[in-house]
Structures are given as C-alpha cells and as structure tokens.
C-alpha cells in the first residue's frame, strides 16, 4: 500500500528494533499504531550509527547484543502488517546491512513483508542509482533526508528521487531530542515545497507535544524518534503502555483534515 497521512499533522514514529527485544518492539509498534501513529519507522540496529545521538546509539547496542539483524526486522514487519493494514511501514537503516543481505534480495523480501518504504540514512541520492532501480522494481518508496545545508539543486534531486514523503531534517548534526527547534526547519520546508508536491515530514529533535504542535503548523507530518526510544529505555517492563500514552498525547495535537 502507498504511504499516506490520513490526518494533518501526520505522525511518524521511529523505534530501534530489538530494543530491549523483538517481542517488546512488536508490542510497542502495535501500541503506537493503536494510539494514532500513521507511519512506523523500523530502525535496523547498526554497530556504527554515526548519524544517531546517544539515545539511539544505546538502543542499537542493546539490540545488537541480542543478535538483532535485518532479516529479523523484516520478519517483524510482516508480523506487524498482519495486524495493521493501513499503517505505513518504513525500514530505516544504514546502507551496510542492506548490502550484506544484497540489495535485490532485500527489496524483494521487504515487499513480501508488506514494507512500504525504505530510508537509508547514509546513502546520498547521488550514489543511489542501483538502489533506486531495485526499489522501483519492487514498488517500494525510497525516502531521502533533506538537510537545511543542502543547496536548492540538491533538494530538487532528493525530491525527484523520493516517493511517499520527503524527510526534512530540522537541523544539522545527529539525532536526539532537543528543547528548542531550529528556525531552519520551517525555512527548509518552504524550500522543499517549491520543488515537490510530496508530503514533507520534519524530524530530528521533536521530543514533546509542544514541539509537535509547533512543527505541525508548517509540516505535513512530524517524525518522533529519540523521544520514543528514550521512553522505551525509561519504562522497562511497561514499554508498550508508556509509548502508547506518549503517542496519544502527540496524536491529540491540533489534528487537521
């Protein structure tokens, strides 16, 4: 199914799969969907997550200790898809795990698992031709990161290569919840609107309902990642319930048809 935001602002929830274990991840994802998440980003743990801040780095370390791998993430996606037909599922990964599996095999397995899109955080659009061919052949949506520092020509190229939505990075640097959002985020969304009609989702640093509401004024969707992972980290034994409560607060923010 295509990625689609049924309400505005849409809510994209990121989880690191396998933290603290895959069964808990499954419960957390289903709780987030029930609480109102439109799209779930299934994070593939990686040993060198250079784009991630300390919260997601710790989550990756915990998941890798249990041996969580890309194949298990795709199995998890298939299980989630059985319970949630209309929720967007995006695999969020560094490039190396995909290359180890093989790009063609990954795309084929992802499609059969019910995955809608893929975001490869360290794959520049300029080097993505083979990846884009495999994605197109399997009707998967490639999603690229657009940064405030990107020149207009590069934003246009990113927008042209993306399907589903464009992920606008609210600021430069690594992921992680922040108390204040950069003004660059709104400017970046305006720039993207000039080159694409795709929905624009803003992420990196949104950690509470107030920030969600602020970003929702100018973005089509809001991505919440580190704050979700930190909620899991702080609520051992009740991860799914805690995430469900947090997502409900976010979902209640000024919905617009």
Annotate the PLM regions.
Residues 11-27, 88-102, 141-150, 178:
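Active-site mouth loops of central-metabolism enzymes
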Residues 1-15, 77-82:
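N-terminal amphipathic alpha-helix/helix-capping segment at the start of soluble metabolic enzymes
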Residues 190-198, 207-257:
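Alpha/beta catalytic cores of nucleotide-metabolism and tRNA/nucleoside-modifying enzymes
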Residues 13, 32, 40-43, 110, ...:
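Conserved, mostly hydrophobic/aromatic
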Residues 22-33, 150-159, 202, 206-222:
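Catalytic cores of alpha/beta
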Residues 2-5, 22, 47-58, 65-78, ...:
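Active-site-adjacent beta->alpha loops and helix N-cap segments on the catalytic face
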Residues 11-15, 40-42, 89-93, 118-120, ...:
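Hydrophobic faces of well-ordered beta-strands that scaffold small-molecule active sites
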Residues 37-47, 113-119, 124, 168-176, ...:
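Glycine-rich phosphate-binding active-site loops on the catalytic face of alpha/beta enzymes
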């Amino acid at each position: 199914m295509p990625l689609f935001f049924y309400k505005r602002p849409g809510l994209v929830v990121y989880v690191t799969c396998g933290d603290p274990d895959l069964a808990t991840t499954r419960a957390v994802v289903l709780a987030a969907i029930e609480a109102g998440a439109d799209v779930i980003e299934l994070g593939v743990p990686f040993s060198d997550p250079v784009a991630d801040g300390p919260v997601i780095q710790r989550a990756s370390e915990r998941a890798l200790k249990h041996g969580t791998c890309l194949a298990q993430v795709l199995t998890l996606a298939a299980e989630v898809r059985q319970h949630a037909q209309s929720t967007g599922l995006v695999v969020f990964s560094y490039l190396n795990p995909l290359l180890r599996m093989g790009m063609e095999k990954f795309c084929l397995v992802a499609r059969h698992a019910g995955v809608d899109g893929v975001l490869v955080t360290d794959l520049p659009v300029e080097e993505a031709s083979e990846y884009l061919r495999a994605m197109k052949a399997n009707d998967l949506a490639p999603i690229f990161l657009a940064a405030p520092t990107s020149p207009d020509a590069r934003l246009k190229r990113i927008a042209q290569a993306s399907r589903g939505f464009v992920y606008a990075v609210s600021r430069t640097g690594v992921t992680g919840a922040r108390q204040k959002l950069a003004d660059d985020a709104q400017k970046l969304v305006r720039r993207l609107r000039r080159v694409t009609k795709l929905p624009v989702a803003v992420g990196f640093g949104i950690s509470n309902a107030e920030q969600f509401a602020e970003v929702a004024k100018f973005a089509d969707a809001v991505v919440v990642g580190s704050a979700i992972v930190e909620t899991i980290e702080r609520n051992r034994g009740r991860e799914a319930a805690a995430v469900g409560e947090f997502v409900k607060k976010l979902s209640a923010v000024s919905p617009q048809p």
